[in-house]
Curated annotation (Swiss-Prot):
Catalytic activity, reaction form: alpha-D-glucose 6-phosphate = beta-D-glucose 6-phosphate
Annotated organism of origin: Saccharomyces cerevisiae (strain ATCC 204508 / S288c) (Baker's yeast)
Family statement drawn from the similarity comment of this UniProt entry: Belongs to the glucose-6-phosphate 1-epimerase family.
GO cellular component terms, semicolon-separated: cytoplasm; nucleus
Active site positions, chain numbering: H159, E264
Modified residues (Phosphoserine): S88
Other remarks in the entry: Present with 8580 molecules/cell in log phase SD medium.
Entry keyword set: Isomerase, Phosphoprotein
Name assigned to this protein: Glucose-6-phosphate 1-epimerase
Enzyme class: isomerase
């Protein structure tokens, strides 16, 4: 069976290859495993909570309606870090396509985390579509403002944890020449390095990255992950390194930072403002492609 549903999760298996699969937790609609020909592509902490007691550390958590902590908006500032989507149990809406196997999940205030909904009393409908190709994974989001009178202001981000061999031998390409905001230094500047490399904690937001740029994770000169995006102009690059890993109870093993890198496409540098009745769509596509260096434009 290409689609299997349990109380806690939905599992998709590709009809042409049963070793290619994706596991989606209903809590947070979080993809926590994606295997291509038996090989895991995503990083998941061995201490990640998959029981709905807290957001999942690893996989692809969904960030909505706020990225990080907000200090200026009357309602968004009351929400915890990264909002309420990853802290809510989504409704499984069913299968929309047999091949490639495609399913949808929905979230609206009536079923979202009630404590957080009280803090952010807005009207919305989220539809997440997960499509498992034979050689790719696509996660798409549609946000609808279901209010008849109020504007909907929000961020969106796919907090994707990629699995890698060794962070110190890993590079991220095709972000050269982009303006970024360094969340550790609290500074903005243009990244003039040809590739992103890692030897310490990294937490930066690249802004206005053209959708034509395929962001690639490279290990010793070989492409291991390619990320394509639609309508997601910002890209967060994050690795907690040694000290921050030690301080996160659900981050295990503590050396796990060596085997993961977060490349997170989103719309977070500023807010999306959606008029009543309007919809906003975006997606990320995770795949494998030949190494292609896109120079500074």
């Amino acid at each position: 069976m290409p689609i299997k549903e349990t109380d806690k999760e939905v599992v998709l298996t590709h009809p042409a290859d049963e070793t290619t699969s994706v596991h989606i937790l209903k809590y947070g609609a979080t993809v926590y495993s994606w295997k291509l020909k038996s090989e895991e592509q995503l990083w998941l902490s061995t201490a990640a909570k998959l029981d709905g007691s807290k957001p999942v550390r690893g996989g692809i958590p969904l960030v909505f309606p706020v990225f990080g902590k907000n200090s200026t908006d009357e309602h968004l500032s009351k929400l915890p870090q990264h909002g309420l989507a990853r802290n809510s149990t989504w409704e499984f809406l069913g299968q929309t396509k047999e091949n490639p196997p495609t399913v949808q999940f929905g979230l609206k205030p009536e079923i979202a985390n009630p404590e957080l909904t009280k803090l952010w009393p807005m009207d919305y409908l989220l539809i997440l579509t997960v499509e498992l190709g034979s050689d790719y994974l696509k996660t798409a989001i549609e946000v609808e403002n279901t209010s008849s009178s109020k504007e909907l202001k929000f961020n969106w981000l796919f907090h994707t944890y990629f699995r890698i061999e060794d962070i110190e031998g890993t590079m991220v390409s095709n972000l050269a020449g982009m303006k970024l905001y360094d969340q550790l230094l609290k500074e903005s500047y243009v990244d003039k390095h040809p590739v992103v490399t890692f030897n310490q904690e990294t937490d930066v937001i690249y802004q206005n990255v053209s959708a034509e740029r395929a962001i690639q994770i490279v290990d010793k000169g070989v492409q291991i992950h390619t990320l394509k995006r639609y309508n997601l102009p910002d890209t967060v690059v994050w690795n907690p390194w040694i000290e921050k890993s030690q301080g996160m109870a659900d981050f295990e093993p503590k050396t796990g930072y060596q085997q993961m890198i977060c490349i997170e496409p989103g719309h977070v540098h500023d807010f999306i403002s959606l008029a009543p009745g309007k919809k906003w769509n975006a997606y990320q596509l995770l795949c494998k492609e030949e190494l292609k260096y896109q120079a500074i434009q």
